[in-house]
Amino acid sequence: MERPGLVLQDLPPEILINIFSHLDEKDLFTLQELSTHFRNLIHDEELWKNLFKSRVHTTHFPTFSQSSKFSVEYIERTRGLHHWQHNKAIRTKYTIIPTRNWDQPSIERIVFDYPRVAAYNDGTITILQLQNHKRQKKFKKLIYIPCTTPQGCSTMDFNINAAVFGRFDGRVFGKLLSNKSYLTPVMEFTGRHSAGVTAICNSESWDTSREDWSVSGSENGEIIWWCENKLVKMWKVSNRVIWKLAFFKDWTLIMDDEKLYIIHQMQELHSIDIPKDLDEQPMRVRFFKMDFGSMTLVLADLNNVYTISVNPNGNFGNLRKLEMPEQICAVEIDEKTSQREQNWQFAGDDGCYISLLTTQNTLYIINIRDLSSSGLKVQCKISFDEQVYVSQVTNLIVVVALPNVLQILNAMTGELIKTVLKTEKFPEFLKVSQDKIIMGSGNVLNYLKFVSSDSKKHHHSTKGKNTVSNKWNETLNTELQYYDEDEDLRRKRQSEISRLIDAYGGDLELSGDTDEENDIQLRIALLESQEAQARNQAEAGEPVGDDEDEQLRRALEESQLIYETQTNSSANHGNNTNDEIDEDDEEFLRAIRQSRVEDERRRHLRNHTTGRRNGPLSDDNFATYGAAESSERTSTENTIGSSVGVDASNNVDEDLQLAIALSLSEIN
C-alpha cells in the first residue's frame, strides 16, 4: 500500500497540480495531511489557479475577496455561495403610502444602498431605514419627503443623495437628501440653459461626506456642472442634442447623436465617434452603462453590444463587439464594482460583470474587463422556461425575478444556488446590496435578509418566548394582506353607495345574498310585465279578465302573508320594532285594504257593464218612456263612472305594484 503513495509523490509537480485541480476543497485539505510534499503543492497558488480553469474555464473574473491569492479567492467565493445557498430568507413587507388617497402612486425608481432604501414616485421621495436604532425612542423606518415634480419637467435623475429635474425652458431644480435641506421645497438652481434640458444626472458617488454634484445637458449641446444648487461651470461641447450623461468624481461622459465626449476635471476634452451600423450610420443606442473602474463604456442596441475604452491614459478608443442571436431587452451592470477602480493585482484581474437579457428569456453573463480575447466573450448562458421580469448581477451571483419565484445563481457557472418562493407575481424592481435583496412592484417593497440557522437559534435563545417564528410572521403578513384587500373592497363599495345616494337619493346594497337579490329582481320584473300587459290591454279596449285580477289578488295575499310572517318572527326575537316601523306597517296595511276595496269596486263595475252590454234584452226594460229615459240616464252615469273608476284603478294599481315591489325588497 505504500508503493502507490511513493509513486504518486514521485510524479512531477505539474502533473500533480493538474490532478489535484480536479479535486474538491475538502479533499485537498485531507491530502495535505499525508505528506509535506503534498502540503507544499496544495499551498502553491498555481494549483488554485488551475482550479478556476477546470471549473469556470477562465482565470479572469471579478474579485470577491479583494486578494491577490487565488487560494483565498477560491475559498471566499465558496463560503459566499454557501451563505446564499444554506441561509434562510426572512422577508419583511413595506407598503409605501405617502398620501391618504385610495389610489396610491406606483414607485417609479428605487435605489438600494444598505441600510438605506430610497424610492421615488411622482410627488414623494420615501426613505426606508432597514437598521433599527434602539437608542432612538422615536425612530421611524419610513420617512416621506414631499418632492413635487416641477411643471414642464423634461428629464430627471434620482439617487440616494438627491433628486434633480430639468425643464423644457432650460431651468434646473433639485432637492437634496443628504442633510436637513430635504425639509425645504424643491429649489431652483442658480442658473439655466439657453435651451431645453435633455439629460441630467447626479454624481454616482454615494459618499455622503462629499458635496452633492450634478451635471445637465441641453438640446443645443450645453453642459453645466452644479455643486449643490450653484452653477460651477458651463461649457458648450457640441451643436447637437445631448442624449446621455454619466458623472463620477472627476470624470464626465457625454453622448450626442454622433460622438462621445470625455471630460476630466471639467477641463480636458476628448472625443470619439459612436460605433456605426451596417449602413454606416451611428448606431441607435438603447442601453448605456458606464464602468468607471476601468473607464469602459457599454453601448447596446437590439442586436449588438459594444464596449469602448474611454480612458485617455490607456487603450483609448478600443472597440469590441458581440452580436447577439436574440433581441436584447435589458442590460444590467455590477454597480459596486463599476464604481471601484480596477486593481490588476487582484486574483482574476478584478473583472466586472454585465448581464444581457433577451426576449427569449435567456441571460448572458459577460466580463467586460476581460482582455484575453479580441472580442467580447460570454462567461455563461442561462435559459429560463418562464418569463424573466428583472435581474441583477453582482461579482458573485445573479438574481433573477420570475413570477412568484426568485432564483439566485452562480454568476460564473450559471448554477442554481437557491430558490425563494412566494414572491411578487409581477416583479418590477430588484436590487442587491451586502447580501440583502429588495424587490417589489406597485407601491409594495419586500426586503429579504438571509440569516444562518445558528444565528437564528441564538436569536431564539436570547429572546425566548417573546420571539415570533418566521412562519408565524409570514402567516400574519398574509392575513394582513387579505385584510387590506377586504378593506379596500369595503371602501370601494361604500364609495359607490355614497355616489348613488348623492346622485339618485338611494343606494345599491352590494353585500347582500345573491339568490335573494335575483329573487327580488325576478319578482319586480314579473310585476312590471303584468303592469305593461294590463296597460296595453286597456289601451286596446280589451277587458282585463278575471285571471289578472286573481293574480293580483294572490300577489296581495302573498305580500301580506310574508309581512305577517316577518312581523311574527320579529316579535318572537324580542319585539324591538320602534314607532317609526309601526307607522310604516300600518300605512302599508291601509294601502292593502284600500287596494282591496278599489279592486272589488272595479270588478263590480266591470261585471255590471259587461252584463248590461252582453245580456239578453227584456221587455221590462222598455215598459214606459219614462222608465227608458231613466234607464238610459242611469246607464250613461254608470258608463262615465266606470271609465273614471278604471283610470283611477289603473293609477292605483301602478302605485300599488311599486309599493309591493319595494316592500318585497325590504322584507327580503
Swiss-Prot record:
GO terms for biological process: cellular response to methylmercury; DNA damage response; protein ubiquitination; SCF-dependent proteasomal ubiquitin-dependent protein catabolic process; ubiquitin-dependent protein catabolic process. Residues 564-585, 599-639 are annotated as: Disordered. GO terms for molecular function: protein-macromolecule adaptor activity. Keywords: Phosphoprotein, Repeat, Ubl conjugation pathway. Pathway: Protein modification; protein ubiquitination. Residues 547-566, 583-602, 651-668 form the UIM domain. The modification Phosphoserine is found at residue 511. PANTHER family: DACTYLIN, F-BOX_WD REPEAT-CONTAINING PROTEIN 4. Residues 5-51 form the F-box domain. This is Ubiquitin ligase complex F-box protein UFO1. The lineage of its organism: Eukaryota, Fungi, Dikarya, Ascomycota, Saccharomycotina. Transmembrane segments: none annotated. Present with 639 molecules/cell in log phase SD medium. The modification Phosphothreonine is found at residue 514. Pfam families: F-box-like.
